[in-house]
UniProtKB/Swiss-Prot annotation:
In the N-terminal section; belongs to the FGAMS family. One of its GO terms (cellular component) is cytoplasm. GO terms for molecular function: ATP binding; metal ion binding; phosphoribosylformylglycinamidine synthase activity. Pathway: Purine metabolism; IMP biosynthesis via de novo pathway; 5-amino-1-(5-phospho-D-ribosyl)imidazole from N(2)-formyl-N(1)-(5-phospho-D-ribosyl)glycinamide: step 1/2. Monomer. It is an enzyme of class 6 (ligase). Phosphoribosylformylglycinamidine synthase involved in the purines biosynthetic pathway. Catalyzes the ATP-dependent conversion of formylglycinamide ribonucleotide (FGAR) and glutamine to yield formylglycinamidine ribonucleotide (FGAM) and glutamate. HAMAP family: PurL_1. This is Phosphoribosylformylglycinamidine synthase. SMART domains: GATase_5. It is found in: Cytoplasm. It comes from Shewanella denitrificans (strain OS217 / ATCC BAA-1090 / DSM 15013). The gene is purL. The lineage of its organism: Bacteria, Pseudomonadati, Pseudomonadota, Gammaproteobacteria, Alteromonadales.
């Protein structure tokens, strides 16, 4: 084993954060230093050249000064017997660089802690801060790392002696293994194994428990119900299915696959053909939709729980039909009170929590990062979400009790596209190969399905922790590329049937795969790829290692499938084959036995059906006492409530531009304020048709009225999507995610009431279908605190996601108030007809009350009328701004619109009934629209004719104030900047705890500025002019290599941009270059695309670059290309980082910087303003001096020069091509206008001859005007960024 020191693992402020954590835990530490340590397992010794080569490969990150660390060593490494995702990717890079003697690379972090002697409890507390005990260990000396490469022998099978000891043996196993089997299930298993005349193996019991858990089988939703002694005629699931029975229109697949499918638009799907050439394929672009929850893992380990929640949902989408394409995501969180240190709010009572779960603050600091990181690395934009905090002692249907989200809701969902011929699963033929595609088995995530089906606190802490999975999004990206290549083959798609591997691991996925196709299967356990050779059969078969799919491929198509996988470097293995007999056999060649030998009907067939006999309860809660509440105090508290407040800290961490198909993300207007009501995507690059999605949830209302909460969730999702051009209710489909504390008094009957309200009544009346959903029935946390029994129970929680087919994405209306449209009016659309019910409102919450009566949708025809008029006005472009009334009431609606428009507003309440507080803060269904004064009267008449109350309530003002009047009486007035401070301070506090606090403060200050002009545009050319047109007319399309490496995710939009400019875009994988299948000699141009090559394990883009520099074939290819006279190259984001590390073979690039961690130490997704500099770059010919917004999405974009002299040289040679600037045109030095901290705002640079340009921002994602988060109204189809691609075409003549 060789040991190689690496770069510092923690920046100064990360060390400071760790020191603060030590201080909070009463660990007396004086200083901590941390650095990466690399361990190389060799088959034979390296020579001197190879040693230097390995040292170069492992040199990344900040430069390290030679020194000897001081203090006690805590060496954190992956758990011996495992292979980390870092290891597999770094080892791949080493092999691609020709270092075949390296059997494996592994990495750890050496923490050197200077402290006085720590006692055992302090040592334990310190270690808890330094490592993840599920996947890591701590050593106290370097030599111990040798055990990382020890090989352990497989553990043997265990059986349970049911024949000898009877039922008792199974009861003991149930508890020991955390199976969560019900009494009747234990009886069922005993009866079946007695009938089979053999004892069950532990693997069979775990498999049964996972496959039949509440999580997987949805027993409560399929149960028979008796309520208050009356037998109900329908199950919950039947009531949901009723929506499809009544309105099957536009539903292509429901209730039977990993996601539902609805009819989409006809568009030109853009992808490469079998020769690798990208082209448009005009066909139906159907929409798949799925929303999952990952609540239990997120409560235990927030980052991993949220990351694998997003990853699992993405796999569900990709595994729909015979393979499909995930497109855009959503995320949501409900947690108990944050209790931010130094910022605890008046309504936040300290109730405590059990030790085994983390705090709500930890969930919201770490969980969103996990979800965002997975989406970012996979390459899916996360475009919409919600965040609610709720924890309160209330008087509800059970008297006084604490309700809240100690068990959080972590929502992960999204939409994708699927070909018409692939919507339905195919037939698994007898003898078909049954394949696992993706990462290796690891001993993590055991029993997740059963664990998440229990109320928190019913299982042991070790079992809880064992049930959390770990993530590797770059692996999932590789798998998705394989699926993409398969569905792109159309009729020749080799995939017959596909499922994702989720709860229960292979033990659930393979039986489900064959059972759904009416087949059985013969499997070989030792064919399952594994990174832990010491695992038992149960651990191999039942673990929930992520990033895996199971699928069937006919034997005659196996060679083609293998070829695709090898090109994408996606691991796969044939684990079994399909049989005609519905029997499951798992052979173990190592022990020469059969761990599983069962008829499928025992596993999945006739398990006992659940019956629930429950009693309903009604809430009795006192009304909110308004007598001691002032409007000013209400405003201060409500704008600080996380449910209402600025959610920037949850949004800028997530890529919102990848794919180049995003039309509407969360950020609105020139000031990029996060107030969008919905997300909108384009169906493709050649159309204005698209898709929209929105979220609705009003969960606290359920504490007063279950049915009202459900109706309001559905209605809110409609209100949020109403500003898009959909046309008809029948073009909207809903996902329903139901969360409940089943068994808690009153909750079961309440759940039934809520499902009935939606499934039997409201949705059929609206002609809306719910073709997909999910349930989580254990939303309760119980624990003992010094002998006192405590519990926190969530409200019955329905989260609705609406998905719609958009006719014209250009017509989408946002909440941005327009001050450039002449005389305008603000109209309040009130669907409650004057009611001001405050029960369950944010106003009640921030004054520690629940209230008495909840708002409700009293008449579905009102919502229908509202939607129909809205659709007419949206299509006519008669509405300037739109925002629905929801959390925080009318005051919040208007205030957020003013923030988005950076303007003042004045509203008059005199047309409304009720107290000041009730009028301003009720959360009845409604919306505010801005219309031209000339049209206000006619629009008002349209709404009134449709049964919707409509009131003129005010307009914009010249001053930067929000003024509320009641006739002549001033009810409230305040500077917009002060309201923005109140609204954004929660986000600032969270950002300062999580990220670089200096950056957080700079952004918080900018938000309060009254002089910031926001995003501005200055163009020195005509973007509507197609300068490439004369050359395209020649009929010659120069060949462009769209270069990608494993983990790259921005290649399709790049290909589309060059295709539009007249190039022949060709898909080129690095494996094509390394294998010699493709030569760069064929191409005039090369573009290295953005993403996360190799998961950025050796620094962003550095592993990719080194696999070129240290591989002779690749080095020769690239060197020849760069030295050619008529070649050119572009590197964007990850491609920029990669090319910056190829300086030694790119002429004229010797002064280029490399790109390192952003100053904020966070992934930054922004719309930034850049100015084109005068430079020799062929891409920016004729564009100098132009200032334009552009998408930025990266974690390592800070330009770091080798020296001050190198930076001076780069500036003096005039090769700086782009700079970040402010809205007034100055070089941006402050965050976030300079999103990464690069010196002098540098964001792009070129070679001295202008042939090679590298840039961190993404022009390919915004080459269409509709793909920009904000743009001036007068831009046409092409945004100004299209010019740079056309300039390249012009250069070739």
């Amino acid at each position: 084993m060789e040991i190689i020191r690496g770069a510092p693992a923690l920046s100064a402020f990360r060390v400071q954060q760790l020191m603060k954590a030590c201080d909070a835990a009463a660990i007396p530490v004086r200083h901590i230093y941390a650095e990466f340590m690399h361990f190389a397992h060799l088959t034979n010794a390296l020579n001197d050249t190879q040693t230097l080569q390995l040292a170069s490969i492992l040199t990344y990150g900040p430069a390290i000064e030679a020194h000897t660390p001081k203090g006690q060593l805590y060496l954190v490494t992956p758990r011996p017997g495992t292979i980390s995702p870092w290891s597999s990717k770094a080892t791949d890079i080493a092999h691609n660089c020709g270092l075949s003697q390296i059997k494996r690379l592994e990495r750890g972090i050496a923490y050197y802690v200077e402290a006085d002697t720590l006692d055992a409890s302090q040592q334990k507390a310190l270690q808890a801060l330094l490592y993840d005990r599920m996947v890591e260990v701590i050593f106290d000396d370097m030599a111990a790392a040798e055990t990382l490469f020890d090989r352990t022998e497989p553990k043997a099978l265990a059986s349970v002696n049911v024949l000898g000891e009877g039922r008792r043996a199974l009861e003991v196993a149930n508890s020991r293994l955390g199976l969560a089997l019900a009494e009747d299930e234990i009886d069922y298993l005993v009866d079946n194994f007695v009938r089979l005349k053999r004892n069950p193996n532990d693997i069979e019991l775990m498999m049964f428990a996972q496959a039949n858990s509440e999580h997987c089988r949805h027993k409560i939703f399929n149960a028979d119900w008796t309520i208050d002694g009356v037998v109900q005629d329908k199950s919950l699931f039947k009531m949901i299915k009723n929506t499809y029975a009544v309105t099957p229109d536009n539903v292509l697949s429901a209730y039977k696959d990993n996601a539902a499918v609805m009819t989409g638009s006809v568009a030109g799907r853009f992808f490469p053909d079998e020769t690798g050439v990208y082209a448009y394929h005009v066909e139906p672009c159907h929409i798949l939709m799925k929303v999952e929850t990952h609540n239990h893992p997120t409560a235990i380990s927030p980052y991993a729980g949220a990351a694998t929640g997003s990853g699992g949902e993405i796999r569900d989408e990709g595994a729909t039909g015979r393979g499909s394409k995930p497109k855009a995501g959503l995320v949501g969180f409900s947690v108990s009170n944050l209790n931010i240190p130094g910022f605890i709010q008046p309504w936040e009572a300290q109730y405590g929590k059990p030790e085994r779960i983390v705090t709500p603050l930890e969930i919201m600091l770490e969980g969103p990062l996990g979800g965002a990181a997975f989406n970012n690395e996979f390459g899916r934009p996360a475009l919409v979400g919600y965040f609610r905090t709720y924890e309160q002692e209330v008087s509800s249907h059970n008297g006084v009790e604490v309700r809240g989200y100690h068990k959080p809701i972590m929502l992960a969902g999204g939409l994708g596209n699927i070909r018409e011929d692939h919507v339905q699963k195919g037939e698994i033929t007898v003898g078909a190969k049954l394949i696992v595609l993706g990462g290796p088995a690891m001993n993590i995530g055991l029993g997740g399905g059963a664990a998440s089906s229990m109320a928190s606190g019913q299982s042991s802490e070790d079992l809880d922790f064992a049930s959390v999975q770990r993530e590797n999004p770059e692996m999932e990206r590789r798998c998705q590329e394989v699926i993409d290549r398969c569905w792109q083959l159309g009729d020749d798609n080799p995939i017959q049937f596909i499922h994702d591997v989720g709860a229960g691991g292979l033990s659930n996925a393979f039986p489900e795969l064959v059972n759904d196709a009416d087949r059985g299967g013969r499997f070989n356990l030792r064919n399952v790829p594994s990174d832990e050779p010491g695992m038992s059969p149960l651990e191999i078969w039942c673990n929930e290692s992520q990033e895996r799919y199971v699928l069937s491929v006919a034997p005659e198509n196996l060679a083609r499938f293998e070829q695709i996988c090898l090109r994408e470097r996606a691991p796969f293995a044939v684990v079994g084959e399909a049989t005609s007999e519905q029997h499951l056999t798992l052979a173990d060649s190592h022990f020469n036995n059969k761990p599983i030998d069962l008829p499928l009907e025992v596993l999945l067939g006739k398990a006992p059906k659940m019956s629930r006999d429950v009693v309903s309860k009604k809430a009795l809660s006192p009304a909110l006492d308004e007598s001691q509440i002032t409007v000013d105090e209400a405003v201060t508290r409500i704008l600080s409530l996380p449910t209402v407040a600025d959610k920037s800290f949850l949004i800028t961490i997530g890529d919102r531009s990848v794919t180049g198909l995003v039309n509407r993300d969360q950020m609105v207007g020139p000031w990029q304020v996060p107030v969008a009501d919905c997300a909108v995507t384009a169906a493709s690059f050649d159309t204005y048709a698209g898709e929209a999605m929105s979220i609705g949830e009003r969960t606290p209302l359920a504490l007063l009225d279950f049915g009202a909460s459900a109706r309001m969730a559905v209605a809110e999702s409609i209100m949020n999507i109403a500003g898009t051009d959909i046309g008809s209710f029948k073009r909207i489909k809903l996902s329903a995610n139901w969360m409940s504390a089943a068994g808690h008094p009153g909750e079961d009957a309440g759940l039934y009431e809520a499902v009935k309200a939606v499934g039997e009544e409201l949705c059929p009346q609206l002609e809306i279908t719910i073709p997909v959903g999910k349930d989580s029935m254990s939303m309760k946390t119980a624990w003992e605190d010094n002998g006192v029994h405590k519990s926190v129970t969530s409200p019955m929680s329905l989260v609705i996601t609406a998905f719609g087919v958009v006719q014209d994405i250009r017509n989408t209306v946002t909440p941005e108030l327009r001050s450039d449209k002449g005389d305008t009016a603000l109209l309040l659309l009130d669907l409650s007809h004057g009611k001001t019910r405050l029960g369950g409102s944010c106003l009640a919450q921030v004054f520690s009350s629940l209230g008495d009566v909840a708002p409700d949708l009293d008449d579905s025809t009102t919502l229908k009328g509202f939607f129909e008029v809205m659709q007419t006005l949206v299509a006519d472009q008669s509405i300037l701004a739109y925002h629905d009334r929801s959390d925080g009431g009318l005051f919040t609606t208007v205030t957020e619109m003013a923030f988005a428009g950076n303007t003042g507003a004045e509203i008059d309440l005199s047309a409304l009934q009720g107290s000041d507080l009730a009028r301003l803060f009720n959360e009845e269904l409604g919306a505010v629209i801005q219309v031209s004064q000339a049209q206000a009267e006619a629009i008002t008449a349209q709404f009134i004719a449709a049964g919707v109350a409509c009131h003129a309530i005010g307009g914009l003002t010249e001053h930067n104030k929000l003024v509320v009047k009641d006739g002549s009486r001033v009810v409230f007035q305040q500077q917009r900047s002060e309201l923005r401070r109140l609204w954004s301070q929660t986000s600032y506090k969270m950002q300062a705890l999580r990220d670089n606090p200096d950056c957080a403060l700079e952004e918080f200050s900018l938000k309060q500025s009254e002089t910031d002009p926001g995003l501005t545009v200055k163009l020195n050319f005509d973007p509507s002019q197609d300068v490439a047109a004369p050359y395209i007319l020649k009929g010659i399309a120069p060949k462009m290599a769209i270069l990608r490496e494993q983990g790259v995710n921005s290649h399709v939009e790049m290909a589309a941009a060059f295709d539009r400019a007249g190039f022949e875009s060709r898909d080129v994988h690095m494996s094509d270059i390394l294998s010699g299948r493709i030569s760069l000699d064929e191409f005039q141009g090369l573009v290295a695309c953005g993403g996360f090559s190799y998961g950025d394990v050796l620094g962003a883009g550095e592993g990719w670059a080194k696999s070129i520099l240290f591989n002779q074939r690749a080095r020769d290819e690239f060197s020849r290309f760069f030295e050619r006279d008529l070649s050119f190259a572009l590197g964007v984001c990850n491609g920029c980082q990669m090319l910056s590390n190829l300086k030694e073979i790119i002429p004229g690039s010797e002064h280029w910087p490399r790109f390192v961690r952003n100053r904020s130490e966070r992934f930054e997704a922004r719309v930034s303003l850049v100015e084109v500099q005068q430079s020799p770059s062929l891409f920016f010919e004729g564009m100098a001096g132009s200032r334009m917004p552009i998408a930025v999405s990266h974690g390592e974009g800070l330009a770091e020069f080798a020296s001050m002299q190198a930076m001076t040289a780069a500036e003096s040679t005039g090769t700086v091509a782009l700079r970040y600037v402010t809205g007034t045109g100055e070089i941006a030095t402050q965050y976030p206008q300079n999103p990464n901290g690069s010196p002098n705002g540098l964001s792009g640079i070129c070679s001295t001859d202008g042939k090679v340009t590298i840039m961190m921002p993404h022009p390919e994602r915004v080459f269409r005007t509709v793909a920009n988060s904000w743009h001036p109204d007068n831009w046409g189809e092409d945004s100004p960024w299209m010019r740079m691609f056309r300039n390249a075409r012009v250069k070739l003549g």
